[in-house]
Curated annotation (Swiss-Prot):
Signal peptide: none annotated. Its main location: cytoplasm. It comes from the Bacteria. Pathway: Purine metabolism; AMP biosynthesis via salvage pathway; AMP from adenine: step 1/1. The lineage of its organism: Bacteria, Bacillati, Chloroflexota, Chloroflexia, Chloroflexales. It comes from Roseiflexus castenholzii (strain DSM 13941 / HLO8). This is Adenine phosphoribosyltransferase.
Amino acid sequence: MTINLTDLIRNVPDFPVPGIQFKDITPLLQHGAAFKQVIDTLAARYEGRSLDAVVGVESRGFIFSAPLAYRLGIGLVPIRKPGKLPWETFAVEYDLEYGSNKLEMHRDALDPGARVVVIDDVLATGGTVAAACQLVETAGAVVEEVACLIELTLLKGRERLANYSFFSMLQY
């Protein structure tokens, strides 16, 4: 039985700041069959693609990237906010929907030529995911695809990712 995932996404107005319509995925995560459906869908998409790693973007990208890496039997590479990784890092600054931030990835996380899928929960303006892709490429690896659970189409984040194959499960 296929679950309508949109029924499990809660809209929270004015969070984290006024004017933002936040898509809360926690009801979906609390629904075991729905969460399984998301991971099963991603796993079916990426099985047999000869990927070397799944790259997860802090923090909610970890929720989907870790079980996907497990299912595919490949490594998980976390991309984190500044000061969270204990080793030498690559870093990139980026703009997001409601401010700016920086992301980091361990310098030794990916071998040159490694093929990866980058996973995050929501694509808004595309700034965070574009920065994650930049970090992957700085390491000499190749972004095979970017995947997000939710795409906020009015914010046109996909345009920032025009050089990458992109997949989203839900569009708003």
